[in-house]
């Protein structure tokens, strides 16, 4: 166990690894790219990321496309393209909710769990998103809450949804 000082000077909310020594770290005040060297973290300036002023709630790094998908509290979801060094905004406004989790659905799509707008699906290449699983209050046999805490996809491709306050929905 090695305790490191927090060079980010902010509460760390999410971590994604890029390679053996580089990481993205989300905080309650923004996002940083860091390098682990000699058992210390060094901040690596990346201008597009350094400008993000948002509470980061969830991160997902897609190795093949070299894109970091960033979920925030009340600022929506967007992607950072490492190769082009630019931020790409999603077409769907998710700025009223917290992005609780970002998980891969398949080779080209991610699921975005929100606290208030159900689950959205986003294409990793185009960053176009759409509602995917939302509650239906008219039926008792469907998901009955749009407040999603977590999602998990098992080997059989079933989607497990931890929704508040009801518990688990499996689709």
Task: List PLM regions with ranges.
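Carboxylate-rich, polar loop motifs that coordinate divalent cations or form catalytic acidic clusters
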Residues: 1-171
């Amino acid at each position: 166990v090695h305790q490191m000082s927090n060079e980010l000077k902010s509460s760390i909310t999410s971590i994604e690894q890029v390679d053996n020594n580089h990481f993205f770290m989300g905080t309650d005040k923004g996002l940083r790219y860091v390098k682990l060297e000699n058992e210390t973290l060094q901040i690596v300036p990346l201008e597009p990321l350094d400008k993000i002023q948002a509470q980061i709630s969830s991160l997902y790094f897609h190795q093949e496309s070299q894109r970091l998908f960033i979920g925030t509290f009340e600022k929506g979801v967007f992607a950072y393209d490492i190769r082009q060094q630019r931020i790409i905004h999603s077409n769907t406004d998710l700025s009223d909710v917290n992005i609780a989790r970002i998980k891969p659905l398949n080779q080209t799509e991610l699921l975005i769990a929100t606290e208030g707008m159900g689950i959205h699906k986003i294409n990793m290449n185009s960053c176009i998103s759409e509602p995917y699983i939302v509650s239906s209050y008219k039926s008792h046999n469907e998901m009955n809450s749009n407040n999603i805490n977590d999602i998990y996809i098992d080997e059989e491709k079933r989607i497990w949804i931890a929704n508040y306050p009801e518990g688990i929905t499996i689709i």
